[in-house]
């Protein structure tokens, strides 16, 4: 997982055969730094740190060589762009295959991606599925689809998924992998095997990192660039950009001890951002290695909760949290309106993050009222239609303010969703369990010009469709 690379160079030898102009550079490459070389300046002028007596000092130096926040953000951006390009290339292949146009709808494509990714990921105690394991048998009982489904079950079991969750996920994936067109060999090779070969080569290496990204949100967005996700208009499937989910998690004062929930989680983008902030806070505040490891496990297993009613989107949320390694313990496929009181009794939420379906009652404020009614402390950050706060959210907004304080209202750009939805939104920030007094000061901020220039070109990358043209990162940080 780590290596020290030392290069020595020189051009001139003296009469004793010694290099008179030596140059030395050393770089530390490690998994913790996503294999980005970090310069070890202390070894440039002397290699004395390599002596056995000094090795502890060298280890201390290497332990402190970490990526800067700027380097991490650059890696994240590059990874997202590369992932998006690879996904679109695979989807273009599916889109251009005339034989598949009537075989795979958009939901099926989501299931193909998520299923093959689950099958191809490594996990402790289970050998990852290799392309060579798929034999393209022309058999109803033993074919590539059956092999993939079996491997998914083993993978989920190894990740300690409950029996109910395994059954739900394999049921959702079953139809597409049991489809004869998918597993029947053509020229000696099944479509499943061809797609898995490309996903294994192009997609999975990008997912097996310690970056906290909304990976499956990127998959969903890439597919919805081409065709609408089934039911997305009825259920308002619009994913919140990652820079906004991170911004909102910070507005809600998320930290290592927060308990974060989202009752309309989509692909889990808010929970991914919250987890990232929580883990970084733990790393900054906990010195003991064993205590830190235990805290990170607790964050992933006990301090995050999400609910999603749509099966095709829920499975993306579960995969996202598995890729985070593994925060899927408290992910529920259900109607949160039926579940929130039951969950509220078991989960001591202190942070509520939400981008609700705006077609719901009160423009989505019904979700807010239900969630905040179960909380006794903390903060909530809600991305919602701006007019919901000026009458269209009644009676829910009035009820919310009886028990909670509106701290801030932040007007967001009307093209926030880059062409996928054109609606004027605002972020409302609440302090929970403190009734709003009419004399309370509310902070109003206009972020409608946030520094990003957006467009929605189907075949363009995020670099093209979202450009920082006027200090956008600094504005959100401020």
Q: What is each PLM-predicted segment?
A:
Residues 1-36:
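Nucleic-acid nuclease catalytic cores
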Residues 36-38, 333, 345-478:
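A conserved structural/catalytic subdomain of Rossmann-like adenosyl-cofactor enzymes
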Residues 58-94:
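Non-catalytic protein-protein interaction scaffold segments in large eukaryotic complex-forming proteins
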Residues 82-104, 199-204:
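Short amphipathic alpha-helical segments and their helix-coil junctions
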Residues 96-113, 207-214:
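Structural motif
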Residues 114-118, 122-228:
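Long recognition/docking surfaces used for binding and targeting
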Residues 217-243, 249-250:
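Class I SAM-dependent transferase core
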Residues 238-354, 365, 385-386:
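Conserved S-adenosyl-L-methionine
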């Amino acid at each position: 997982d780590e290596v020290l690379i030392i290069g020595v160079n020189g051009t001139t030898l003296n009469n004793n055969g010694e290099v008179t102009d030596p140059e030395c550079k050393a770089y530390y490459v490690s998994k913790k730094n996503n294999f980005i070389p970090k310069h070890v300046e202390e070894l440039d002028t002397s290699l004395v740190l390599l002596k056995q007596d000094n090795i502890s000092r060298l280890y201390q130096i290497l332990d402190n060589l970490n990526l800067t926040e700027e380097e991490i953000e650059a890696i994240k951006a590059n990874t997202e762009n590369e992932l998006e390009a690879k996904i679109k290339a695979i989807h273009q292949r599916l889109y251009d295959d005339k034989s598949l146009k009537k075989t795979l709808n958009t939901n099926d494509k989501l299931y193909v991606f998520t299923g093959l990714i689950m099958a191809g990921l490594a996990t402790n105690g289970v050998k990852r599925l290799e392309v060579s394991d798929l034999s393209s048998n022309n058999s109803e009982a033993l074919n590539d689809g059956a092999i993939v489904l079996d491997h998914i079950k083993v993978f989920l079991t190894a990740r300690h998924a409950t029996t109910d969750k395994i059954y739900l996920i394999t049921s959702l994936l079953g139809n597409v992998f049991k489809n004869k067109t998918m597993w029947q060999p053509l020229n000696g090779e099944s479509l499943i095997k061809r797609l898995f070969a490309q996903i294994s080569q192009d997609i999975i290496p990008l997912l097996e990192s310690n970056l906290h990204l909304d990976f499956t949100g990127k998959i969903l967005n890439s597919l919805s660039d081409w065709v609408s996700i089934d039911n997305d208009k009825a259920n308002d499937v619009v994913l919140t950009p990652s820079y906004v989910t991170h911004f909102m998690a910070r507005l809600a004062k998320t930290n290592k001890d927060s308990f974060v929930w989202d009752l309309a989680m989509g692909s889990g983008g808010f929970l991914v951002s919250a987890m990232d902030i929580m883990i970084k806070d733990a790393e900054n505040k906990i010195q003991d290695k064993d205590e830190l490891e235990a805290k990170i496990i607790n964050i992933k297993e006990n301090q995050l909760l999400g609910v999603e009613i749509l099966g095709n989107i829920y499975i993306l949320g579960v995969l996202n949290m598995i890729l985070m390694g593994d925060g899927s313990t408290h992910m529920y496929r259900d109607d949160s309106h039926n579940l929130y009181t039951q969950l509220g009794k078991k989960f001591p939420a202190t942070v509520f993050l939400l981008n609700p379906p705006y077609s719901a009652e009160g423009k989505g404020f019904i979700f807010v009222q239900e969630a905040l009614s179960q909380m006794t402390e903390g903060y909530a950050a809600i991305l919602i239609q701006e007019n919901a706060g000026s009458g269209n959210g009644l009676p829910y907004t009035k009820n919310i303010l009886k028990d909670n304080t509106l701290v801030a209202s932040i007007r967001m750009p009307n093209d926030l969703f880059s062409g996928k939805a054109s609606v004027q939104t605002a972020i409302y920030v609440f302090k929970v369990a403190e009734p709003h007094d009419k004399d309370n000061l509310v902070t109003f901020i206009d972020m409608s010009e946030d520094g990003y220039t957006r467009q929605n070109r189907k075949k363009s990358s995020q670099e093209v469709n979202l450009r920082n043209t006027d200090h956008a990162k600094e504005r959100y940080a401020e």
